Amino acid sequence: MNRYRYESIFFRYISSTRMILIICLLLGTGDMSAMGLKKDNSPIIPTLHPKGNENLRATLNEYKIPSPLFDTLDNSYETKHVIYTDNCSFAVLNPFGDPKYTLLSLLLMGRRKYDALVAWFVLGRACGRPIYLREYANCSTNEPFGTCKLKSLGWWDRRYAMTSYIDRDELKLIIAAPSRELSGLYTRLIIINGEPISSDILLTVKGTCSFSRRGIKDNKLCKPFSFFVNGTTRLLDMVRTGTPRAHEENVKQWLERNGGKHLPIVVETSMQQVSNLPRSFRDSYLKSPDDDKYNDVKMTSATTNNITTSVDGYTGLTNRPEDFEKAPYITKRPIISVEEASSQSPKISTEKKSRTQIIISLVVLCVMFCFIVIGSGIWI
């Protein structure tokens, strides 16, 4: 009789231990990935195969940011003006200035390789807000722009990253269901072997959507141009959003889940283009006292007499391969995922999450040890 009682206790003990082990595995992951779900019950977006990430680095230039006025106060090209009226789809920002002509020039000079940088900014009253930054090294002039052996991850403004991504040509900025507050003057800066290609596009948002994300505009994030002499992505709290295509899929799924128009191919023809603006439009825009624009809170006036370019202040990309060997390799999964929930605190870092996982695992192990001791005592 005692034998059957002990066997029953033993099997109950084994079942309890197995359940604790399963709980430990789920908690140890720090998310719901063990069950194939995110915390919001949406499917996990797969990242690229590790082989597709072997040429990605966190940064190639020690986190430095060029100035949106890297070229001149005046634009290199006419300013394109587009109007977004398609309420729940994508706004496509594609200013003038194609890098293929620069690559062709390099090819004719016998240069087979180049380094490059692509950055997006939104301009305000005597200030600029970095939106996106990505660097390229050891690229081929015989291939389309961005065909490189080494790339950095895309560094993003945290708020723009939730609903924006860069198109597969590495150049166009795509914004999903933009709200009216995102109207403004956007600047794209391309630097190829130190030569800048600067181009602007004025976005006017007339149609908006019920789920368009608000609260993206923040005057405190629009920095005076003097900031960019020594500015870095760290000083701006910019984030790495993982592999570009996984980031793109995040944004598209967010739009689709909210009932937006998810077209198979995002094209620029969805935008209404009006007459182009002159090259000097940027200068007049920066000086305009329009209160609807970004306004650097530290500036007491709208004058731009003291605005100068910062070509000498940017010492980022070089042509020396040894400079890129110093940059640390990244992990294969996104460093900071793009979460759709607006309640998520931007202060939570992956390091804090790792410490929490360790503490939870230790607590579970202690409970398991107690069960083993108690079970051994009962069996004896």
Swiss-Prot record:
Task: Output the SUPFAM superfamilies linked to this UniProt entry.
Answer: Immunoglobulin
Organism expressing this protein natively: Gallid herpesvirus 2 (strain GA)
Q: Which GO terms describe its cellular component?
A: membrane
* Highest taxon above the source species: Viruses
**Protein name listed in UniProt:** Uncharacterized protein US1141
Enumerate the Pfam families for this protein. Answer: Herpes_glycop_D (PF01537)
InterPro entries assigned to the protein according to its UniProt record, in alphabetical order: Herpes_glycop_dom, Ig-like_dom_sf
Q: Which residues form a coiled coil?
A: none
User: Gene3D superfamilies, alphabetically?
Assistant: 2.70.230.10
